[in-house]
Structure formats: C-alpha cells, structure tokens
Amino acid sequence: MRVLVTGGTGYLGSTICRALTARGHAAVPFARSTGGDVRDRAALSRAAAGVDAIIHSAALVSVWRRRALDFDDINVGGLQNVLDVAREHQLRRVVYTSSFLAQAPAGRSTPLRANDYQRTKADALIVARRAADAGAPIVTIIPGVIFGPGLMSEGNLIGRMVADHLAGRLPGLVGPDKIWSFAWVENVADAHVDALEHGTPGAIIEAGGHNLPQRAPFEWLLQNRGTRLPRTLPYWAATVAGHLELTRARLTGGMPLLTPATVEIFRHDWPLRGGIGGTFEEQMAEMTR
C-alpha cells in the first residue's frame, strides 16, 4: 500500500516509515518540516491523493503552550481533518496514534485531563470512537511511554531523561515508584503496520511494553553504567517548582521544565496491556550504546 504518514519525520513517525518500507509498503511522510500541517485540510487532501491509507501519528506533544488552543487545533482538529480527507478519498484504512494519557490511569474510571496535551488526546479518542461508530475504517493504537534510540524530541521522554541524567542535568524523579508501560519504539511502529494490514475497523489496541516503576531505566544505569540513582523529589516540592516554572515560562516565553499538571500525572500508575517484544535490559542496552 501507499501510506501517508502524518508526523512522518518525527520520532515515532520516522520509525513507522521505516517499518512500512521494510514490509514492502510505500511511506509518504507528511510533516511540518516538509511543508505539511495537519491543520491545513486542503494541503492534507492534496497529499492524500493517490494513497491507500493514512497513519496519523502527528501530534502536539508538550507540557505547556502559551496558546492552549494549539493543542485543540492539532490534536483534535488534526484528527478530524484526517478523517474528513480519508472519507473524501475513500481510503481503505486510517491508523491513529493515541496515547496512554488519553485513558484513565489505574484506579480511575475517567481520563485525568491534567494538562492540555492530556485533555486534547482524550477528546481526540472520543472523536476516533465516534468516527468508528459511524463506519470510518479507523484503528486506534494506544502506546505506552515510547522509548528507544533516535530523535531527542518531546515524544522521546525516556531518551531525554536518560540523556539528561547522564549529563548531570536531571534534577530528580517525581513518583519513581509509579508504574509506567515502557514501549520500545520499533515495536510500537510495528503495531501500527499490523493495524494497517490486519486491524479490525473500530479496534482500540494497547501497544504497551514493560510495566515497570518509573525508576527502572535509572536502576539499569546504576547496575550497568555505575551511575547514581536520581534523587526523589517530593510531590509538594515538585508542585511548588512547577508553579515557579510556569510563572517563568509565562514571563519569558520559554518552556517550563515542570508544571503542576505534570506532577499530577506522576502521582498515578499507567500500566497497559499488550507487552510487546524483547527484554527491557536488551532495549536499554541498545538505547544507551
């Protein structure tokens, strides 16, 4: 198949493009770095001419933006544009990249919606479900915390945290005992291609990995690289720091290192089903080579 990949030059998107090529498909990246913007429905429609399917991995992944509506325009409006274009061109399949943060954490029945990213990914999941109910050929993938080698972007949280720790720039961990689902980036990409080829329209597939404490990568570094464990930041101290960082960001236009909403996310466990591929130890070794 010829497949348009939104966000195709990003951390996950570029890995999806490679996975598509490896399976004999033709990947067509659509990304802002190459002149594509999911907010531009006309541009998206032009790019979709002649393709068989869309994998929609583009998203605004950030802890904060001065203009909160950017999250709505990209994360919710972008998905709606993809669905409209898929219907216009009568495409065979849409595979949508959601997020574990769009779902409820362990012990809750509703999504947390702590920050604008989480809020809009939860809203977009509702859009995806409604589209599926209306007959759209959409399959939704819900990855865990994606990690692995590659771009040090907002989407590569673990890679950035590990790099910061090794460089002495990581202040500490908030909620180190809380469970995350560490999902290897290549496995998540393969899950998208599986959904493209074999997924049932309307399905929501958890592409989880290893359900481990947040501190797990740093314990591996301690055992295999001899680094110290990061210190634990109490929730109250992290919340105060988050408020100070938000104030600084609003005054300077910079990006906060932490926000109170991020601290709230770190208070919860985020396990997923669907543990896929390889051992955590092997994956950490490859990521830190």
Give residue spans per PLM region.
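NAD(P)H-binding glycine-rich loop region in Rossmannoid oxidoreductase-like domains
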Residues: G36-G77, N81, V85, A102-G107
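Conserved catalytic-site region of short-chain dehydrogenase/reductase
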Residues: V63, S99-G107, I146-G150, G155
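Conserved Rossmann-fold NAD(P)-dependent oxidoreductase catalytic core, especially the SDR/UDP-sugar
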Residues: N81-T120, V139
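Conserved beta-loop-beta element that borders a ligand/cofactor-binding pocket
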Residues: I126-P149
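A conserved pocket-lining segment of Rossmann-fold NAD(P)-dependent short-chain dehydrogenase/reductase
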Residues: M161-A183, N187
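Mid/C-terminal beta-alpha module of Rossmann-like enzyme folds, strongest
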Residues: A191-G254, F280-R289
